[in-house]
Design a protein with these regions (language model features):
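Active-site His/acidic residue clusters
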Residues: 256-276, 322
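Anion-binding catalytic surfaces of enzymes that hydrolyze or transfer phosphate/sulfate esters
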Residues: 245-247, 251-261
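Non-catalytic accessory regions flanking glycosidase/transglycosidase catalytic cores in CAZymes
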Residues: 1-249, 282-286, 290-318, 322-511
Length: 511
């Protein structure tokens, strides 16, 4: 494998006076499944725990996640959602039945964390709830009742039941998932089978009072565009002015790993070849987003329906001596770079892509946080999210290359070594820059045209080794720091990025 590096790893233009689509803050969403130690131990410790908590919810985790201004949180799954019956998780905790988590570790849980606890968590986080309904093993009536229980405010049967359980006012629910991975753990259904079920569940997931649900129809794995087309055919016909109002988004899932599905590679022990295989896989998300978008464009040219990537992130082999069903993995600088190139892809596809959820928030897959008893650490991925918060609800600014960027050959495929995106809001511009080359710095130049800019403030997340990661003994081994040497001369931003680094530069727009 070889690297082709021009004098400038990136030489690009950004027209500040030609903003593009808004980057929905919901592209920075998160995911909490009843899986391993995500909900139990990660979020929920119970009111009797010595770990500081509010109503059983860990205080340190809430405070850390509030730093990210997380816009939405998906729950209770995942595969778990299609075995979850919501009535098991309401009412007095002592009366809730125990259930077996058949998908994840075959462990027994006591339903201590249910609907009321999840909604309390969302209130503490200041985030929008994204609830996944049970299509795989549940009934249409269950879906209808759960939505009524959550969102109806009058004297209806489910509203009365909610009040019996201690909650007078209805909650606001932003997103409701119609199933999860129905082609696999959600029922092993064909696309046409699921489409019929989804139409029923979506019909009875009603809007009550002033609450307006965004219904997300469970979609494809990776680049299964035929699945997306089947779902689009259910709500629109070619040439129709508007899609039918059954669901407002169609989802897909895409995970990044270095090896095969059966042997994905280790989180912190990997070769350079495995590193570059990871980056090639991560960058492929652009092709897949574009493919699903093209299918949707044929049926919905005005982009009234959104595309959702409601599971994404790195998936490695579990850490040694941990339950293989708990999906616990460390989180290295490499993971943060996978996140940053996804963000750039999201920004560039903001017209159609409206929602994304990284898997998962605590102790599972590409986590923001890891916990061990009362201890908690932030991962490099947490820092990548924090550095990118300025893109939430900003207007995207396309980054146009003037010359071809540097590339690295991965088994005959040229993989770009630099990724970039930009946005503007509130009188400022935020430029994101990623150097994927783990062995060489990258000089980048971005010509910011159309508006005057000043006062660059640059932050970088980098490490000497892309396998570097934070531990409970060294929680700040990988942490953001100021990036020196960034200049703006006659509107041209110049910066040198360290190897394997993610940087953001905030600039002030002239009034």
């Amino acid at each position: 494998m070889s690297t082709t590096t021009p004098d400038l790893a990136l030489d690009a233009v950004v027209d500040l006076d030609v903003p593009g689509p808004t980057i929905s803050r919901h592209l920075y969403g998160h995911f909490a499944e009843h899986l391993g130690r995500c909900v139990y131990e990660g979020f929920w410790v119970g009111e009797d725990s010595d770990i500081p908590n509010v109503g059983g919810i860990r205080t340190d985790v809430v405070e850390a996640l509030r730093e990210l201004a997380i816009p939405n949180l998906r729950w209770p799954g995942g595969c778990f959602a299609d075995t979850y019956h919501w009535r098991d998780g309401v009412g007095p905790a002592a009366d809730r039945p125990r259930i077996v988590n058949t998908h994840w570790g075959d462990v027994v849980e006591d339903n201590a964390f249910g609907t009321h606890e999840f909604m309390a968590l969302c209130d503490l986080l200041g985030t929008a709830p994204y609830i996944s309904g049970n299509v795989g093993s549940g009934t249409v009536q269950e879906t209808a009742d759960w939505v009524e229980y959550l969102t109806r405010g009058d004297d209806s049967p489910m509203a009365r039941l909610r009040r019996e359980h201690g909650r007078d006012e209805p909650w606001g629910v932003s997103f409701f998932g119609i199933g999860n991975e129905p082609w696999g753990c959600g029922g092993n259904l064909r696309a046409d089978q699921f489409a019929s079920l989804a139409r029923q569940h979506a019909t009875y997931a009603r809007d009550h009072g002033g609450n307006r649900l965004v219904r997300v129809a469970a979609g494809a794995s990776d680049d299964d565009y035929a699945w997306t087309e089947t779902l689009m055919q259910q709500v629109a016909k070619l040439g129709d002015a508007e899609p039918r109002d059954l669901w407002q988004m169609v989802s897909f899932h895409f995970y990044t790993f270095a090896g095969t599905w059966g042997d994905k590679g280790a989180a912190t022990e990997f070769t350079r070849d495995e590193y570059w295989a990871t980056m090639r896989k991560a960058l492929d998300v652009r092709r897949i987003i574009a493919g699903h978008s093209a299918v949707m464009d044929a049926y919905d040219p005005e982009a009234r329906l959104g595309l959702a990537l409601d599971e994404w992130g790195t998936w490695w082999n579990v850490e040694r001596d941990t339950n293989p069903g708990f999906l616990y993995q460390q989180n290295a600088m490499r993971d943060a770079l996978v996140a940053s190139v996804h963000f750039d892809a999201f920004h560039d596809h903001a017209r159609r892509l409206r929602l994304a959820n990284i898997a998962q928030t605590v102790n599972v897959l590409q986590s923001m946080l890891l916990t061990d008893g009362a201890k908690m650490i932030k991962t490099p991925t947490f820092h990548a999210f924090a550095m990118s918060a300025g893109h939430h609800d900003a207007a995207s600014l396309p980054v146009r290359e003037r010359v071809a960027r540097a590339t690295h050959d991965v088994d005959g495929t040229p993989v770009g070594t630099v990724s970039a995106s930009a946005s503007t809001k509130d009188g400022a511009v935020l430029v994101s820059l990623t150097n994927l080359d783990p062995d060489a710095p990258a000089t980048v130049r971005v010509d910011l045209r159309g508006r005057a800019v000043s006062d660059p403030v640059a932050t970088v997340l980098a490490a000497d080794d892309p396998a570097a990661h934070n531990t409970f003994d060294a929680p700040d081994a990988v942490a953001p720091r100021p990036l020196d040497g960034v200049t703006v001369t006659d509107g041209v931003l110049t910066a040198e990025l360290p190897p394997a680094a993610f940087a953001t530069v905030r600039l002030t727009l002239a009034s």
